[in-house]
């Protein structure tokens, strides 16, 4: 059996369902341990999937559950500080996903090689910034740029850039799914693509 677009959509729907159920559970019991454990387990599961794609039928559903636990906990924390932020984040994510899918299918956005290189490079740059911030936090260094809650215009602009780059990564996923399906990729790649989609689509 080979990968199909319909199969990928089905696997993505299953993954989202698992993520939502786990997220709701984590949101209601408000356990910091569960939230942190979800982040760590999700990260490890994602790494396993990246280096062993054949494991995706097992690791992708697990990743969805772990990330649901993590996102449910962090959503509760933000909801206590900023009223309505969780609903707004979920709504914005859904609108971005739908809009980009329509733009991709209509040909308005074409993932050329330069486009792909640019998105990958920008994503890598953002990752490095967050990595430096994470390491710096152990030494008392705080990058205010990464905190839009401080009201700084630079922080807000940076956050918008991060959202834009994360959104453009969805276009790369759409292109990958279409090409892989046309080229007869193995069936397990449906789960791999589903993991990639839910990872990028997570509200931030």
Where are these regions (language model features)?
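Small-residue-rich segments of transmembrane alpha-helices in multi-pass membrane proteins
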Residues: 64-77, 120-131
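Structural signature of hydrophobic alpha-helical transmembrane segments
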Residues: 30-40, 83-95, 156-166
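Short, hydrophobic transmembrane alpha-helix segments
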Residues: 23-32, 51-54
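Cytosolic juxtamembrane amphipathic/interface segments immediately preceding
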Residues: 2-8, 182
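Interfacial loop-to-transmembrane junctions
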Residues: 178-197
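Cytoplasmic-side transmembrane-helix entry/capping segments in multi-pass membrane proteins
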Residues: 58-67, 87-91, 113-123
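C-terminal ends of transmembrane helices
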Residues: 44-57, 100-111, 174-176
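Residue-level detector of conserved catalytic or cofactor/ligand-binding positions
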Residues: 198-204
């Amino acid at each position: 059996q080979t990968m199909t677009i319909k199969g990928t959509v089905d696997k993505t729907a299953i993954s989202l369902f698992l993520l939502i159920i786990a997220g709701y559970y984590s949101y209601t019991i408000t356990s910091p341990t569960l939230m942190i454990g979800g982040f760590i387990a999700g990260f490890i599961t994602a790494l396993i999937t990246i280096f062993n794609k054949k494991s995706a039928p097992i690791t992708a559903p697990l990743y969805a559950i772990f990330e649901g636990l993590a996102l449910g906990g962090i959503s509760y924390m933000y909801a206590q500080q900023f009223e309505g932020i969780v609903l707004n984040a979920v709504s914005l994510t859904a609108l971005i996903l739908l809009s980009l899918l329509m733009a991709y299918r209509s040909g308005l956005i074409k993932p050329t090689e330069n486009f792909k290189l640019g998105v990958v490079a920008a994503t890598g740059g953002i990752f490095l910034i967050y990595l430096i911030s994470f390491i710096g936090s152990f030494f008392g260094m705080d990058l205010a740029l990464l905190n839009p809650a401080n009201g700084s215009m630079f922080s807000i602009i940076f956050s918008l850039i991060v959202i834009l780059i994360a959104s453009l990564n969805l276009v790369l996923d759409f292109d990958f799914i279409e090409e892989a399906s046309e080229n007869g990729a193995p069936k397990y790649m449906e789960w791999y693509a589903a993991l990639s989609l839910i990872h990028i689509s997570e509200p931030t």
